[in-house]
């Protein structure tokens, strides 16, 4: 064994549930993981439910698997916490039983958002100024939907919390929340790091369902005998307040001080900038969330489906390349990057149309497409198209970062790049060239769960603070310096792409094509 003390983080992600065990030096010891799906509710367009009964059973198995793989006694786990996708909520009755749950991008409340904007035309901007959130993925429209469509559940609702909080409720029986994830509900003060129940009251919703708030790294209870029997964790193990996946992931990457910048490249890409104030964007283009570090807010741009688009491209169009990669014994993405590396900057003029830059107040995207393809197979090869997708994700990230830098006044010469996309050497170099900034790749596989272990360690006195341990344990793998000539070329590509994207949005507006995704109420 590496140490006698261990910490366990539950990670309720978009695509899977996980339980990850770390030692006190931040070394990953084991992981239990199962994929899950968040399915639409029959007859409810754009819904994405959270099946808390099924998903709790999955998490039970993940915890048992992680403990078994670690080869340790459950009593060696000195604290347990949880993180999750953000925006998702769970509602409870007066006895603490779950009533209703939705996952992060549930967009069922289309009519309700339109109603709120009509009846309270200034409320969204007013609420954004206080919370950093719009109605796009907010809790209030979802509660209004429940009130109008499932009144029997709404009347029974006595409490709510976020999905990461829910996992801790299952362990401890305590219904509580914390700023980083509750902050994504849109009913939470950036400045005061507390609920804003008056928002709910203003639009005619219950204002007494918001639970106590504790900062990340606070012990809120202990593992109950029931939860112990279900999970294999020792009864009495401290249950520690965790946080939202992106903010705890930032801690796991060492992005914990004002002015630091990160890009997280997963299914969605997030562009994150730490700032020392609760400032919001006058243009309402960018969301702002509480960090897990008190005193820091995090401006966040979001690029939709960058990772998912890559998977679609691989699976739908690259069967031959996947077969060749398998024959060579390498990852298919690595082989596609090899092909893309032979293509010049700008990908022979190919313009991918997928995610727009972020416009949080009017958040929607054009129909997916590739523009400006050539019928010359050498110019529009699979490698060229793949490179165009990598360049496009970097360009949209750059545009979001520019928006953030403009309203925050923050500037930085470097970007911490993490997530699956950061494994690609070409993609990392493209991000450096597009942004004109040094790109640093940390040595960490499970940054979000690692951030959770920091919270556990603070709670039991192993570490003095999340920020301090994050800085002491972060290690760097690689760094990429920008090429100034490529930077200039990418500025031209970005301008062409913006004009092309505007034209594609007009087709959506005219009903000719279908938006890849749009927020409720648009």
Language model: regions and residue ranges:
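Activation-segment/catalytic-loop signature of the eukaryotic protein kinase fold
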Residues: 344-441
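Short beta-alpha connecting loops at secondary-structure transitions
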Residues: 43-47, 99-103, 288-300, 385, ...
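Glycine-rich phosphate-binding/catalytic subdomain of phosphoryl-transfer
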Residues: 46, 61-328, 516-517
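A short acidic Gly-Thr/Ser loop motif
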Residues: 10-15, 83-85, 243-244, 264-268, ...
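N-terminal glycine/serine-rich phosphate-binding loop of ATP-dependent small-molecule kinases
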Residues: 1-101, 156, 228-229, 233-238, ...
């Amino acid at each position: 064994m590496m140490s006698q003390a261990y910490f366990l983080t539950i990670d309720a992600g978009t695509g899977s549930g996980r339980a990850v065990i770390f030692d006190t030096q931040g070394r990953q010891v084991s992981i239990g993981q199962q994929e899950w799906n968040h399915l639409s509710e029959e007859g409810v367009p754009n819904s994405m439910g959270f099946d808390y009964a099924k998903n709790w059973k999955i998490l039970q198995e993940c915890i048992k698997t992680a403990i078994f793989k670690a080869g340790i006694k459950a009593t060696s786990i000195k604290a347990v916490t949880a993180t999750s996708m953000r925006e998702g909520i769970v509602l409870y009755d007066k006895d603490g039983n779950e009533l209703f749950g939705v996952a992060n991008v549930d967009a069922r409340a289309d009519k309700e958002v339109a109603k709120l904007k009509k009846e309270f035309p200034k409320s969204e901007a007013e609420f954004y100024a206080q919370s950093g959130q719009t109605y796009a993925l907010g809790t209030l429209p979802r509660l209004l939907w429940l009130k109008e469509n499932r009144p029997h559940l709404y009347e029974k609702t006595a409490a709510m919390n976020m999905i990461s909080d829910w996992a801790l409720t299952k362990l401890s029986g305590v219904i509580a929340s914390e700023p980083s994830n509750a902050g994504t509900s849109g009913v939470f003060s950036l400045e005061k790091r507390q609920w804003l129940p008056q928002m709910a009251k203003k639009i005619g919703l219950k204002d007494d369902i918001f639970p106590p708030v504790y900062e990340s790294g606070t012990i809120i209870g202990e593992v109950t005998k029931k939860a112990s029997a279900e999970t294999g964790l020792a009864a009495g193990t401290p249950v520690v307040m965790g946080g939202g996946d992106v903010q705890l992931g930032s801690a796991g990457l060492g992005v914990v001080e004002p002015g630091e910048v990160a890009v997280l490249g997963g299914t969605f890409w997030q562009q994150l900038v730490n700032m020392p104030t609760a400032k919001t964007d006058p243009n309402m283009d960018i969301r702002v969330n509480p960090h897990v570090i008190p005193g820091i807010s995090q401006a966040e741009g979001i690029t939709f489906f960058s990772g998912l688009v890559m998977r679609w491209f691989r699976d739908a169009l690259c069967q031959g390349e996947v077969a060749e990669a398998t024959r060579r014994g390498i990852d298919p993405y690595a082989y596609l990057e090899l092909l893309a590396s032979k293509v010049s900057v700008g990908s022979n003029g190919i313009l991918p149309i997928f995610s727009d830059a972020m416009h949080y107040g009017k958040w929607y995207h054009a129909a997916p497409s590739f523009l400006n393809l050539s019928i010359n197979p050498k110019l529009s090869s699979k490698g060229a198209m793949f490179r165009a997708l990598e360049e496009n994700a970097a360009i949209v990230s750059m545009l979001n970062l520019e928006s953030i830098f403009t309203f925050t006044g923050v500037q930085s010469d470097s970007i911490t790049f993490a997530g699956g996309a950061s494994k690609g050497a070409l993609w990392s170099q493209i991000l450096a060239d597009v942004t004109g900034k040094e790109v640093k790749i940390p040595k960490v596989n499970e940054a979000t769960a690692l951030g959770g272990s920091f919270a556990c360690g603070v709670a039991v006195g192993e570490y003095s603070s999340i920020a301090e341990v994050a800085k002491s344990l972060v290690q760097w793998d690689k760094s990429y310096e920008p090429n100034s000539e490529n930077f200039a070329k990418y500025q031209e590509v970005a301008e062409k792409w913006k004009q092309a994207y505007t034209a594609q949005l007009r087709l959506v507006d005219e009903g000719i094509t279908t938006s890849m995704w749009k927020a409720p109420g648009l």
